[in-house]
């Protein structure tokens, strides 16, 4: 994924290293936001819809992980943060690959094309 993501992927990884772990309230928000988006947001091109769906499912999985850990497990907070961090890494790799790979060829929007040129060598 990183190789396919190109320099955009490396930029996201650098940004990731300075990002804090989300709070529990933010994961709860992600979970409910996923439900709303799933039912009300089904627009865009076929490729864009697939990408958005994958990102929605990743966010939903993080939300479900939060609820399971909070209500049914006596899991240590550090372990929970580690699991969340693994999911964040996967999500950021996927976003980086999408930004520098797919969107360039599927969205014919002028300002987005200019933006993606910044990530090219």
Swiss-Prot record:
UniProt superkingdom: Eukaryota
Subcellular location: Membrane
TM stretches of this protein: 1-21, 55-75, 92-112
Keyword field: Membrane, Transmembrane, Transmembrane helix
GO CC, one annotated term: membrane
Other known facts: Partially overlaps FAR3 and STB2.
Topology versus the membrane: Multi-pass membrane protein
Principal location class: membrane
Transmembrane as UniProt keyword: yes
Name of the protein in its database record: Putative uncharacterized protein YMR052C-A
